[in-house]
From Swiss-Prot:
<dbReference type="Pfam" id="PF00595">
    <property type="entry name" value="PDZ"/>
</dbReference>
<keyword id="KW-0519">Myristate</keyword>
<dbReference type="InterPro" id="IPR043537">
    <property type="entry name" value="Tiam1/Tiam2/Sif"/>
</dbReference>
<feature type="modified residue" description="Phosphoserine">
    <location>
        <position position="695"/>
    </location>
</feature>
<dbReference type="GO" id="GO:0048013">
    <property type="term" value="P:ephrin receptor signaling pathway"/>
</dbReference>
<keyword id="KW-0677">Repeat</keyword>
<keyword id="KW-0344">Guanine-nucleotide releasing factor</keyword>
<dbReference type="GO" id="GO:0044291">
    <property type="term" value="C:cell-cell contact zone"/>
</dbReference>
<keyword id="KW-0449">Lipoprotein</keyword>
<protein>
    <recommendedName>
        <fullName>Rho guanine nucleotide exchange factor TIAM1</fullName>
    </recommendedName>
</protein>
<dbReference type="InterPro" id="IPR001331">
    <property type="entry name" value="GDS_CDC24_CS"/>
</dbReference>
<keyword id="KW-0832">Ubl conjugation</keyword>
<dbReference type="GO" id="GO:1904338">
    <property type="term" value="P:regulation of dopaminergic neuron differentiation"/>
</dbReference>
<keyword id="KW-1017">Isopeptide bond</keyword>
<feature type="compositionally biased region" description="Polar residues">
    <location>
        <begin position="958"/>
        <end position="975"/>
    </location>
</feature>
<dbReference type="GO" id="GO:0050772">
    <property type="term" value="P:positive regulation of axonogenesis"/>
</dbReference>
<feature type="domain" description="PDZ">
    <location>
        <begin position="845"/>
        <end position="908"/>
    </location>
</feature>
Amino acid sequence: MGNAESQNVDHEFYGEKHASLGRKHTSRSLRLSHKTRRTRHASSGKAIHRNSEVSTRSSSTPSIPQSLAENGLEPFSQEGALDDFGDPIWVDRVDMGLRPVSYTDSSVTPSVDGSIVLTAASVQSMPDSEESRLYGDDATYLAEGGRRQCPYTSNGPTFMETASFKKKRSKSADIWREDSLEFSLSDLSQEHLTSNEEILGSAEEKDCEEARGMETEASPRQLSTCQRANSLGDLYAQKNSGVKANGGPRNRFSSYCRNLVSDIPDLAKHKMPPAAAEETPPYSNYNTLPCRKSHCLSEGATNPQISLSKSMQGRRAKTTQDVNTGEGSEFADSGIEGATTDTDLLSRRSNATNSSYSPPTGRAFVGSDSGSSSTGDRARQGVYENFRRELEMSTTNSESLEEAGSAHSDEQSSGTLSSPGQSDILLTAAQGTVRKAGALAVKNFLVHKKNKKVESATRRKWKHYWVSLKGCTLFFYETDGRSGIDHNSVPKHAVWVENSIVQAVPEHPKKDFVFCLSNSLGDAFLFQTTSQTELENWITAIHSACAAAVARHHHKEDTLRLLKSEIKKLEQKIDMDEKMKKMGEMQLSSVTDSKKKKTILDQIFVWEQNLEQFQMDLFRFRCYLASLQGGELPNPKRLLAFASRPTKVAMGRLGIFSVSSFHALVAARTGEIGVRRRTQAMSRSASKRRSRFSSLWGLDTTSKKKQGRPTINQVFGEGTDAVKRSLEGIFDDTVPDGKREKEVVLPSVHQHNPDCDIWVHEYFTPSWFCLPNNQPALTVVRPGDTARDTLELICKTHQLDHSAHYLRLKFLMENRVQFYIPQPEEDIYELLYKEIEICPKVTQNIHIEKSDAAADNYGFLLSSVDEDGIRRLYVNSVKETGLASKKGLKAGDEILEINNRAAGTLNSSMLKDFLSQPSLGLLVRTYPEPEGGVELLENPPHRVDGPVDLGESPLAFLTSNPGHSLSSEQGSSAETAPEEGEGPDLESSDETDHSSKSTEQVAAFCRSLHEMSPSDSSPSPQDATSPQLATTRQLSDADKLRKVICELLETERTYVKDLNCLMERYLKPLQKETFLTQDELDVLFGNLTEMVEFQVEFLKTLEDGVRLVPDLEKLEKVDQFKKVLFSLGGSFLYYADRFKLYSAFCASHTKVPKVLVKAKTDTAFKAFLDAQNPRQQHSSTLESYLIKPIQRVLKYPLLLRELFALTDAESEEHYHLDVAIKTMNKVASHINEMQKIHEEFGAVFDQLIAEQTGEKKEVADLSMGDLLLHTSVIWLNPPASLGKWKKEPELAAFVFKTAVVLVYKDGSKQKKKLVGSHRLSIYEEWDPFRFRHMIPTEALQVRALPSADAEANAVCEIVHVKSESEGRPERVFHLCCSSPESRKDFLKSVHSILRDKHRRQLLKTESLPSAQQYVPFGGKRLCALKGARPAMSRAVSAPSKSLGRRRRRLARNRFTIDSDAISASSPEKEPQQPAGGGDTDRWVEEQFDLAQYEEQDDIKETDILSDDDEFCESLKGASVDRDLQEQLQAASISQRARGRRTLDSHASRMTQLKKQAALSGINGGLESASEEVIWVRREDFAPSRKLNTEI
C-alpha cells in the first residue's frame, strides 16, 4: 500500500525526442518550525486496491481497468495481481503509477490566479532526489540498490531517454503554496533549490559520473522490469511519435501545442500532431488556456513491458504549482528593486530536474522580490515557461549549470513555505530579497479560532525579534541584539502578510509607535517600532509588497493602474449591492408571509456580508495605492461605518472596534480562511474544522457534500462509464457564472465550494490508510495535520470512536516493516510513512499502592480535556521513577475510571482526594503492547534530515491554550497543561536586546548579501525607468506633519458633529419627554451645552490657525510649519482651563449605566432609543455618543505628541509643543482626579444642594467643573455637639466657584447593632459623613488672624456670615493647613471666588462670560485675551483712573491663564503673581510682548509671525506712550536661552505684563471695530534691555 503520487503525466506530445511533462500541486499553509523534513517514501502494503486509484479531475478520465486494457493487460489479471497483500515489496510487481492528478479548469477556480496549471515532469523524472539517498540500499525495492545512476553531467546535459534509476524525490515536490504565493519550478532552479540533497551535501555529484557513459546511447532501448523511467521520454522512447492517447487525437491539446510553437520560436523545431479543426488565439488567455485531462501514467502506453516498469511506483508527492508563469516574470508587480532581462526568461530551466550540483559557499540570490519582470514582445512567453522547459529538457544538450542561478522572483520570496519543518526550501525562501528589516517587538492580538470566530489571543506577551519582510512573508529571527543576522540565519517564525492591512495604533495605552497587522487568515498582530518614521516605513513596505502580489495575480505590470481599475470596479459592485439591499428591505416591509420574509432576510444578510467584503477590499486597495504613491492612508472611520450589526456585535464581544478587528472578522468567514488551519500545528477535532473540506475519497456515502465523488464501487466495479457519470459536470455546474466573474475580478471574495473543490490543484495528495477490519481507503494529510486531527477525521467518517483507537504509521526501513506511534500533537505530514493504520486501543486495570516511604509518589500528570461536551482525563506525562511507570502507565493513556468512579463525573477536588489516597485503582485505555516481530521506531524518517522535536509544536507562537491538569505527585496541587491550541503568540526563549545597528543599516546589509552573490541574470534596463518608483518613496517628516495636522482637524470636525448630533438626537427630544427626571438628564448630559459651545469655538481656533499658511499642502520642510504649530499649540495652552469643563461630564459618566438600565423596564424609553437609532448601529447608540467626549479629551495629548515628535528638538516650536503637551496632560490628570472625588463625595454634594432652604437656592449646583481646590485641613474648633474627639478632626475642604464645602468622613467601621429593652434590635443606618457644611460665596468671608506667627503656623479663619432673614448665626471655622504653602494655595482659591463675586456684583451679571473668542496669532481673536473692546473710536479720551483700575481688574480676571497673584496676609492688596507660575504663564511671558503692538493699526492676520524685516522694523519704530514704554521695558522678555534662564522677578514681570494687557483694554475701548490687534514672536522685537528667565 503506498501513498498515491500527486504527479501524473499526459501523453500529448510525441516526437523523436519526447517531452517530460509534470504536474504541479499546491498546498495551503505557511508554517515554519524547528522540525526538519524529508520526503516520504513510497508506501507499501496491501495490493488489491493499489492499482485502482483514479483521478477525480476529469469527466473523461478512464478507470484503472480500462487503462490496463489499453496497455494490453487484463484487468486484475494474474500478472498484475499481488499474491501477498501485506508484502512489503509489492511495488516490485506494480507497473501502474496510481497517482491522482489535480485537474484544473480555469472556469472553476479563476479567482486563484486565473491561469492554467501545466503538468510538469512527474516525480519519477526528478533524478537524484533524497528518497534514493534515504532508501539507497533497498535492493528489494529498487534495482541495483547500492548504485545510483545520474543521467546528466554537471554541465547540464539532457535526460537520457533510457536509464535505470532509483525512485527519486524532486525538490519541487517539497514546495507548496497558497493561492497567491507561488513558487515556480524555475524559481527552484536556484542552486539552493535544485533538490533536497543539494543543501545537505555534494556527495551526489560522484554519481553523475556513472551516467556520462549512457549519454551516448543514440537509440532508445527498452526499460527492464526492474528499471525506472525518469521522464515521459523514458516511457515512450520505445515508440515512435504519433501515438494517440486514449486511442484518438486530442484536438484541444493539439491545437494548444501548435499555437504554443507559433508563439515560442524555440519550440518550432518540435513536430506537432495535426491541428484540430478548432483554433485557439495566438496568445491564449490564462483563463482559457486548455488543460490536459488527468489520467493514470499507463494510459497510452502500448508496451506491456513498459507497464511493468519500476518507474510507476505509487507514492505521495507534493509539488509546486506555477499558476501565473514559469518565472512569474512577465507580470512585474510594482517595479520595486529591479528585475531580470528578457533573455533571462528564455535561458532559465529548472535544474531541479536535469542537473545536480552543490551550491558554492556564500552563493545567494540576486533579484527582486517584487517579481523578475520582462517587458516587450517576449514578455508573454513566460506563461508557457514550464511547458517549454519540459519539452526542451529532452532536446537541448547545451544546458549550462549556471543557468540554475536565475533571478529570484517574488514567487519564491513570497511563496507559502512548504511545511512546518525548516527544510532547505524554507531556508532558501528566507534568503529572498529583503524589502524591509528591523528590530520589532511583537505581540499577539487576535486569532482566528474554530467556527470562524475571532478571539483575543490568550498568550499576549511582547517579544523582540529581528523581523525581515521578504516578498509577502514576515520572517522572525532570534538574534543576540548585537550582530544582526546573516544569510545563514534561520527564521524561528513566519507570518504570511499577503492581502493584509496595516494600521497605526496611536491610541495604545502603554506603548508608542505601535502598528497592527491583520492578514487574510483572520489573525492580527501588534508590532512596536523604535520611531514614527520606522512605523511609517513598515506600513509602506508591507502594503507595497501586498500591492505587488495583487498585480501578479492579475497578470498586470502597471500596479497603480490595476489598483485604480479594481477600486472603480469595487465601487460599482458596492453601488449595485447597496441598491439591491435597499430593494430587499423595501420588499421586506410589504411581505407578510413568514417563509418569504425569512428568504428575503437571508438574502439581505448575504448582501450585507458582500458589502462588508467589498468595502474591506476597497479600503485595502486604497491603502495599497496610498503606500505606492506616498500619500495619506484612507480614513478608517468610513470603513467602520459599513460594519453590519452582527459584525459590530462580534467586535463588541472582542472589545476592539477597529479596522484590524473588522478585517479579521471578515477574513474569518471568507473562503481564504480554508488555509488557516494549515498554518498552525495544533490539536483540533475534525468536527471543528469548518474550513477544511471532507478529504476522504472513494468512500460509499450518500451525503450531499460527496455526491460529486466516485464511490468505491464505481471505481472498482462499474468501470469507466460510472466514473465518468460520477464526475460529469462537477466542475461546470457547481459554480455559477456570476460567481466566476466575481472571482476573476476580486480573488479575495472567492469562497470555496466543498462540492466542487475535490482535489483541485490547491489541495494535496491522498494517502492510504487501513481500518481495523483491514478495509483500505484514502485520506488527505495536509501540512499542519497532527495525528489527532487525522485520527478524528477518519474515525468520524467511518463512525468509529476516536478515543478508542489510535493511529500507527507503517515504515519500510532496510527491507523491514517497522511501526511508529506518533504523539497526538505530532505533525505526521512530516513523516515518510508508507501507510496509516487505525488500530483499536485496549483497556486494562492498573492498581497502584504507595508504601510507607515518604518519597513514594504516583508520578504521573493528568490533563482534563473537554471534547464535544464530554470530559476526558488523559495521562499527560509519567515520571520514570514513579510508581505509575512501574505499573505500565504510559503518557497518552486515557483514564476511564478512578477507584470505580467514572472519570467524566469527577471534578478537580475529587481528583485531588483520589490522588492523595494511599492506593489508586485505574481503568485505562491504552496502546496494546507490540505484537511479536513488530518493531517500533523511535526516530522515524522525516522529509529533511535533522533533529526532530516531537513534543514541541513547530510554531510555538501559534499554539497554546491553558487547560486544567492535576499533578498526582502533589495531591493538593494543581498544575496547568496545554489542552488545545489557542492562537498566535509570538514567543521566544529569551528577550533580545536592541540591535546596535540601525534598522536601515541592517536592511541594507541584508540586501547586500544578495548583491554580493553572482547571478546569471542582469537587471532589466526597463526597470531603471520603471513608472513605479513612487513605491519606494517613504513619507517625509513634512508629509507626516501635514498628515497629523489634517488628522487633528478632521477628527475635531467629526467630534463637533457628533456632539451636535447627541444634542439634537437625544438631549433636546428627551427634555420634551417624561421618561427621565431632570436629575437623570443631568447625569446623562451634564454640561453638554457648554461643551458644545466651547468645542465649536475651539474648532474655529484650530481652523484659523491652519489658515495662517495658505499653501499648507505645498510645504516641504518642517520649519515651514512654524506658524501653524505655534498657533495649534497656543490654542491648547489658551483653552487649557476651559477643557476642565469635561471634569463634570466625566465625573457623572459613572452614573450613566444606572440611568440607561431603565430602558430595560421602561418600554417607552426603550422605544424612544430605538426610534433615534433606526438602523441599530452601535456607533449611533446613546452610550456610544456619551463616551465620545471622554475619548476625545484624552486623545489630544497623543496628537500633540505626534506633532512634537516630528519637530526639530532644537526648535522653539518643539519647546512650545512640549509645554502644550504637559498642559493637556495636567488637564487629563485633573479630570481623573475630579472623577475620583465625585465618586467619593458626589452624594454629599447632592445632599447639600437639596438641603438648602428658601425660595431661591444660593448654590444651584456643585459641579466638578467648578471645583478649584481640594485639600485636607485640621478643624481646630469643632463644636461640642458633635461629641468628644480624641484629636482634632480632619476635614476635606472643597473650594468651588460658588461655595466652600467642608466634610468630615468617619473612617471607623460600621457600628454594632443597638439593643434596647424597650425596642427590637435594629441596625443604625451608618453614615460615614458625620459632618458636612456648605458656605455659599455670598456668605463667605476670610479674616486675618491677629497672631503674628499665624502664617508660619498655617492657620486661617473662614467665616460663614450670619443671615437675619434666614435666622442663621455667624459661624467661624479655624482651620489649620498641612503647611504654609498649602495655606497659601487655599487662601488663594478662596480669594479668587470672592473676587469673582465682587465682579458679578459690579457688572450686575449672574455668571462669567463664557465665550472667549480667541485664537493665538489671530488678530481680532486676541481681543478676548486682552479684555473687552467695545466698538468705539480711539479718538475718545482715555477713561478715568478709577475706571481704568476697574477695567484692569476685569481684564486681568478674563485672562484665562491663571493670573491671580494673592497676598495671603492681606486680601485687600493688589494680587501678586507667585514665583511658581505655571507653564502657561511662562510661555506667554517668554514668547510674546503684548504692549509693543497696542497702538499698531491696519495689521492683517497674514502678517503674524511674518519674516518680513520691514514689517518688523515698522513695528519696532512705532510710537508708544512713555508710561507704556516703561511698562514695556519692564515686561519685555528676551529670547529664550536654553539653560541660562532664571526665575528672578518672574512675578513682578508677569504682573506688569497683565497690567499692560489691562491698559490695552482701556485704550482699546475707543478703537474702531475694524482694527486688529496682532501678536508676534518676541524674538523679532528684542528690546535693548533683555531679561533672561528659565522655565
